[in-house]
Amino acid sequence: MRLLLVEDHVPLADELMASLTRQGYAVDWLADGRDAAVQGASEPYDLIILDLGLPGRPGLEILQEWRGLGLATPVLILTARGSWAERIDGLKAGADDYLTKPFHPEELALRIQALLRRAHGLANQSQLEAAGLRLDEQRQCVCLNGADVDLTAAEFRLLRYFMLHPGQVLSKGHLAEHLYDGETERDSNVIEVHVNHLRRKLGREVIETRRGQGYRYAGVAAG
């Protein structure tokens, strides 16, 4: 999952970048509101973390612009502004959630997970479950037939994206766009390598190949 972090306080941004990367997210960071307005509307992000007090352009104005353009990407406002009126303004502008600084890193992690599940119609789940597999996002492993299967960081990122899009045909290019940040060279052939690793661990039927199209997450057959 690819996230955009818009935060002008460098120490906090560095801390969040490190934490989110450990959680298996590909993260792009911007500190200027003008840059964020353009990149947030043009790149295929799965979620945006947006500070309100930004240089260049205020975060609330950017959010209103995105929603006016029809951008449906989940947006979590992360700000020191904690008054009730400002929370209302943020939610009215189109924010999906609002977290006031200071905050506990685990709360941010859980809110991000919940927003991503909700965005994919899985809001009623406390953990990510799809087609016979349950993903433990804290330990970055998957439960198969009652047993935990360890995953590498790359396998975890790829499987999480598949499980959030069950039944959808996803091209290598699409997967690369959502699994790597803007600074990483995107080699779609690497996707094939990680798919094969997941098949060896979970069974070949878990991820189908659609020739000329990409891959489809089918999960584990019941029984």
From Swiss-Prot:
One of its GO terms (molecular function) is transcription cis-regulatory region binding. Disruption phenotype: Abolishes Ca(2+)-dependent induction of CarP. InterPro entries: CheY-like_superfamily (IPR011006), OmpR/PhoB-type_DNA-bd (IPR001867), Sig_transdc_resp-reg_C-effctor (IPR016032), Sig_transdc_resp-reg_receiver (IPR001789), WalR-like (IPR039420), WH-like_DNA-bd_sf (IPR036388). The modification 4-aspartylphosphate is found at D51. Residues 2-116 form the Response regulatory domain. One of its GO terms (biological process) is response to calcium ion. Keywords: DNA-binding, Phosphoprotein, Transcription, Transcription regulation, Two-component regulatory system. The keyword Protein biosynthesis does not apply. PROSITE patterns: OMPR_PHOB, RESPONSE_REGULATORY. Pfam families: Response_reg, Trans_reg_C. Gene3D superfamilies: 3.40.50.2300, 6.10.250.690, Winged helix-like DNA-binding domain superfamily/Winged helix DNA-binding domain. One of its GO terms (cellular component) is protein-DNA complex. Disulfide bonds: none annotated. It comes from the Bacteria. Member of the two-component regulatory system CarS/CarR that regulates the expression of multiple genes involved in calcium signaling and homeostasis including CarO and CarP. May function as a transcriptional activator by direct binding to a cis-acting sequence upstream of the target gene promoters. This is Response regulator protein CarR.
